[in-house]
Amino acid sequence: MNHPNPAIVTQAGARRLPRWALLLLCFAYALPGFLGRDAWKSEDMAALGYMAELVRGTSSWLHPTLIGLPTDNPAVLPYWLGAWAMQLAPQWVSADFAARIPFLFLLGLAMVTTWYGTYYLARNPLAQPVPFAFGGEALPADYARAMADGGLLAFLACLGLAQLAHETTPALSQLSFTAIFFYGMAALPYRKQGPTVAAALGLLGLSLSGAPSLAILFGIGSALLHYNDRSTDIVDAASKRRIAGESVAIVVFTLISTALAVALGLLRWKIELPQAQWANWHGYIELLIWFTWPAWPLALWTLWRWRYQLFNRRISRHIALPAWLLLVCAIATLTTGSSDRTLLLALPALAALAAFALPTLKRQVSALIDWFTLLFFSGCAFTIWVVWIAMQTGVPSQPAANVERLAPGFQASFSWLSFAIATLATIAWVVVVKWRVGRHRAAIWTSLVLPAGGAALGWLLFMTLWMPLLNYAQSYTLLVQRTKAQLNAPGCVETVGLGKGQIAAFQFYGDLQLKPMQADGSGNCPWLLVEPSPDLSAPATINNLVWTQSALILHPANKGESVLLYKRQSAALSDDSEQPEAIEPDLDQKSEKK
């Protein structure tokens, strides 16, 4: 039975978003967060540490380690990319920024492939709008282009994308290769070599980026969907053979990437079933709601309005393909320890599904989205500006007191460049809002302009006005500086209990030679860094006959990241006896005031 297509779009509604505006939005979203910041705790910093170990030659390229510790995520490609960038960068480029450059391109690649993937899904004959009796419906190419604009806007609007998409971690690499695979499968009916290469590259990249099990499920399921795709009623024998060959090729690429993952020891089935407790499920529900907002309600509406095309004897690729990728990621989110980073991979497919809701939205629903977005992001921008003013002037007093409580000892600094960029972004937001509430012919993508623009505005304001505060609270830089100040002659330093982010920070920003502590005390390092107990006391595992506590060094914003510094007895006896001291977060500022 043939059911009516729910998409009714005129040619006027299929006009495309101006290219300059779309590119400006993408650059405004992508660049902040990669520029002008330190590596943040702890996954971002730990990944940088593994890359630095590869550059120094102290780790195997096939099995990256950090002072002998393996990676938490069974990945190699993200660390290779960062290490190669650090090796190729000129000396005047800082190593941590050089490591971010390939990840900036990965984010851009995810944006481009999400746009093209949505475009080719919209070119599907079953996705095209209903033809009018006297003409005037949207042309296929124009309709697909407008839908792709909406898909990219939905992708950028997702709240969970911002931070994880600007880290040098395997999560961003997995996102990019998922989007590449999504594009390859979406474009496969319309192109030959390009989409096939993209699908193979996506599967291979996913496997080498720590997600080989997802690559297996993506590849097998998508190959079955492609084999059973009957977008048109006329399919000759040659077309059937071509579709079968392409499906077999996808399966072969899946097997090759799986074999490579097994050979490198990257395939680890780590399934953690959720416990039957409301607290756990409540956390998952909250994550799904805020992380994928505002795409998830639109995606649900798509599944409802296009349900006859989804549950039909004829495979509707434009709904079935993103729905399959979304289903795999949603299940993996429930069965993995890093739920947010797994859910990140669902965003390209989720954005495509959200785009197909746009031709079916009523005007009242579109207006509701606009007003909610306007109030939410305008309120966020106002709050960011008020807190920044409080950091600079102390007025209003309550936000200034909150900053002092959360980041003791933080001293605000003023940057004309950051202020100018933030001001221009805020003015641009006002202009976009004025344009959106004005009277003009509505294109199908207009409902997502404010969500995407608001997400970009909030992220850009965070990365300009609040960057000094975020660096102070989210990095290990100050902790490393205070630790180095306590070392008379920073030779090698033994460690016990430190997180991988801390280890990487002490090695990368502190130039310390860290080694794991020898249980029998046979090491020759004069210093020892230890993770303190929850009450900041010394752990019982430290041999007081070998080590003498020298200082407790507090992280400026998180006491859980503090460290205890010990001196070996043989080195301590040669110095004057001193009582252990606590290095407070505002110690430097207090001494300056005195």
Residue ranges and their predicted role:
Residues 160-173, 212-214:
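Short acidic/glycine- and proline-prone juxtamembrane loop motifs at membrane-interface regions
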Residues 101-139, 156-157, 180:
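Transmembrane-helix motifs of polytopic, lipid-linked glycan transferases
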Residues 47-73, 77-80, 84-87:
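Extracytosolic helix-loop segments that constitute the early lumenal/periplasmic catalytic or substrate-binding loops
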Residues 160, 174-190, 350-353:
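Specific aromatic-rich, kink-prone transmembrane helix
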